[in-house]
Regions:
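Loop-rich non-cytosolic ectodomains and luminal regions
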Residues: 1-189
């Protein structure tokens, strides 16, 4: 209907020109590398997965510290690493969506977040579908050096066809409120 067309436009505005990669997790663990350039003040990463899939996510910092994320424990996680504070938010189940968003917010403990290769390890436990997508914010809000090692060219140009119809307006609006810099609107005065 009319509302869904508007919704898709909003999602496209958020995710278009974002760097992304996608994959299908089955029996083997997957390793995804993200290069974070120097002088990056903040960065957020979205991981979209199917609620039916159970897998462990381990985020490894450039200095080797491992953060174990449990996506099925809904809520929030806050970890201090070498130079970076890592906030993790796991989306709540919704009757309208089969997709769960896990949102990583990297914040500097001093001026910049830790540069180098950050690695996502996805370790399958109970996989029903296995598909996932990982996104960075649009190019304007990050340095040119910050990118996935093997970006997916399709995802770089488009939003996830699956997510654009199922994402809830509420989630977009709550993220806009929480992450003014991410939305591109800047601080409210």
């Amino acid at each position: 209907g009319h509302a869904s067309g508007q919704l898709e436009k909003n999602v496209a505005d958020v995710s278009s020109r974002a760097d992304g990669l996608s994959g299908n997790l089955q029996r083997e663990r997957e390793t995804l590398e993200l290069i974070i350039g120097e002088y990056e003040r903040t960065l957020n990463i979205q991981l979209w997965k199917n609620y039916a899939d159970v897998f462990t996510v381990i985020l490894q910092t450039p200095s080797g510290q491992e953060i174990i994320v449990q996506p099925d424990k809904n809520g929030r996680q806050d970890v201090l690493t070498n130079g970076t504070e890592v906030l993790v938010y796991a989306g709540q189940p919704s009757p309208y969506s089969v997709w769960q968003e896990i949102f990583f917010d990297l914040l500097p403990r001093d001026r910049y977040i830790e540069s180098g290769i950050w690695t996502f390890h996805l370790i399958p436990e109970k996989i029903v579908l296995g598909s996932y997508q990982l996104y960075l914010p649009t190019q304007q809000s990050r340095s040119a050096d910050t990118r996935f090692v093997r970006p997916d060219p399709l995802l770089t140009m488009t939003v996830p066809s699956t997510a654009q119809k199922v994402i809830s307006v509420g989630a977009i609006h709550s993220y806009y409120e929480a992450y003014a810099d991410f939305s591109g609107r800047g601080e409210k005065i």
